[in-house]
């Protein structure tokens, strides 16, 4: 009995181990025969199909040919429609998981593939060379799985467009090398592992299955699942191959070098090989195994080095940047969203953290829509104490909740200046504002806008509140406003820029002028509440006291008149305005510590203090408060016009004003004064827009302003402004309206307005013209600034300034090339040399010449004044070389270049710093916008957008029109009213004398670089806020804030007559064949740039007609888009 049982066990063991090489070869050859046989058959049918096309009639069944072809025979369309339009379409929908049945089918195939792989793992516990008996139940389960795989393979084969391509797909190869051996095992009544490890490649379908089941939804989850499936399937497949060859041995040695290696040991070997080069405890002994390890090591270097770290990063980053920001009570923070890149974050942190000089008390939370790159992550780590990054978007409430917007101090939105579509960039940022305001209406929002016409939509957003600190920084408006000021007053563009840039680079000046310029760079516009000891004093008195006693330059105040509740900014107000309690003052100073002296000043304690540094907070308890009882404002009825613009006008002051507002018929507001008039004719009537801020004219057709080169003698321009624009029919609009508006400000008389001549593509100006058609004295010359003939045709040699605007953004490989056209145009214009007119000649002569002529030639010719805009500040070295300057201020910074110090170049890169300025002190930005945009404030703009009618008295309408606001200009020391100031050896003496006698506020100097070697081309540089002890030179020009009704001509006898003779703008010098610089160089016969044409206070514009500028319609934006 026992002997019979022993024999039975021995027979079973013999049956399980008797898997000969012939049986193994049968399993392998079945797969190879299926693969290559099927491939040959497909190629033969493809060849037969192509051969049949040469026959007129094809004999035999056609459906079989179509089945194996990648194309279709066009006969019998009804049959094709039936088989391939119905049945085939349903199969494709099943296989693509577009239906519920298809999704179930795909999931079922994946689950059965994993089940077949599990069966392989179970069978791999036995030696590879042992064949399992067919009586094993697991074999029947595996056979049923493979039968289903065969059915699925047939469906895929039927639905495939290209059968040969399908045959070579990875999933097809897996089925071909795993399904046939299963049926062979049924015939041989034995089962062998063989190549069934290839089922592990089905794990690559894992991301698709998880998406169907909606387990993963985010892009990071999909990416992580793909990486994970690639790594795992590679491990299992490589381990299966090693398990097979190491247990079977090399075929040519009949397996004599085989070794027993479990599947787990194979996975261990593969893992060790991927991560390092193995540890030597488990190694491959067969030649096939070692060859496989060699190639697998090379592939694993790529796989492990790229995929594994990326997976780890996804695991850690997802948790790190998706968790909500925890707002700590008492800790202030802001949210920054929009364009979050390395460059934008770098610029923002540099400007934002500078305000507190290293003292960090506000945390910055960046809300980025994508995970930070390595460079940005490194930057954030350098500021880890004050920065946080959260991945999300401001368009979703859940992301806004994660960054706790409702608890933030403000939400700042960054714009991408280098985007290809400025309109889309603005629209996306406007949508962010709308989302933030809808989520929490009280959130303070500061946004960067690229195009000024898009500001209209922000004012219409519910809960937008200017008074709560909501602010708009429009780059096009500010940039072109700066350039326009540089056209009105040479050097003013640089003067204003120096007040907002921060110079941290150490520079060692070699020349005296460099020292003066660098000292000016230290000054900034700062604000400070004024001491209540100044209450009741006039602005000139306070400004003089601050200058002499406190060593501070007070230039403007925020004033609150008694007849309405709003505050308005006033630059250099007249003596009729007296200070109220807690008046906000605007200073040009070098530190916030210095301006605090204006707050601490006490008339009792500091009256005898001579050193401004000693003025600090005093312990005075009892002060004389008689000034507090004094009237806050003392205004003469005849002097109402001395007030400046206010944004809120009460309707209760309305009298006898006839207004008519409509889009088709512009509004007409006629202002009539009761003052005595002379020569009151219709020709003298000025037309203004509805705000009274800008000169207006009826819409002009474009063809009326287009100039022809052949009619040069017909339009002999002099003292005009030439603007070179590089644009075409497809590029983004620059927004020339923002450039023209400051040049058409109403505080200049109609006679003072200079002609503006644009040179550029006519197709481009056709797109811009609807924004410019209501401004007077605008002309267009079709052509290019790169063509000398077009420049000469517009009398560029007689212009007061030639502006070269940068090319609209283009996607280029190098950022150096963005300024190519601007640099070449600058070179083209600088090559022109203008001879000074001889005594017998009334016109100057233009001659092309090299920019590097001898010194004698430089003395004979003069250059055309140029202001070039650069998008890339590093391109300044091209301008320096062409300007003939030797780069005496060494350094790569544009703001340290000689060209910048002379006012010859401008770049808007510093405007990024205004975002931080607007957050800490939005009053400074308000003043800047008022200075560079022609006097309009954000609150006034709110009314302009709505076209809200003003119903006021006649006198106050004159105030509202803004015509009485100060003008910035240049005055010479000898040929203007400044010549009557004595003594005036130092800037301090000049400041006090001009303020006391004329109400003129001196703020800076425009000085010659080399006084000892004067020439026609001599350059001047800007000195911002000179020191009180700065000695003046006879050739100095003075930057001044000049009251509207002040006569600036040198007075010898009658003021009114002298005003008509001497108070001129720069038209006169250029009309005589010279330019602004020559007028002060040769004999300095002309004084002011610019001044009024009228001399007496009461005779300013007896009749003024006011019209609205055409407001931007949303349809125009859509049409332009």
Curated annotation (Swiss-Prot):
GO terms for molecular function: potassium channel activity. Keywords: Cell membrane, Cytoplasm, Ion channel, Ion transport, Membrane, Potassium, Potassium channel, Potassium transport, Transmembrane, Transmembrane helix, Transport, Voltage-gated channel. Residues 46-101, 159-165, 210-226, 312-1121 are cytoplasmic. Regulated by changes in cytosolic pH; activated by alkalization. In contrast to human KCNU1 is not activated by Ca(2+) or Mg(2+). The auxiliary subunit LRRC52 shifts the activation of KCNU1 to more negative potentials at a given pH. Disruption phenotype: Mutant males are infertile due to abnormal sperm physiology with no overtly abnormal nonreproductive phenotypes detected. Sperm cells from these mutant mice exhibit several functional defects, such as absence of hyperactivated motility, lack of capacitation-associated membrane hyperpolarization and are unable to respond to acrosome reaction induction. Belongs to the potassium channel family. Calcium-activated (TC 1.A.1.3) subfamily. KCa5.1/KCNU1 sub-subfamily. Testis-specific potassium channel activated by both intracellular pH and membrane voltage that mediates export of K(+). Represents the primary spermatozoan K(+) current. The channel underlies a pH-triggered membrane hyperpolarization during the process of sperm capacitation, as sperm encounter the alkaline environment near the ovum in the female reproductive tract, thereby playing an essential for male fertility. This is Potassium channel subfamily U member 1. It comes from Mus musculus.
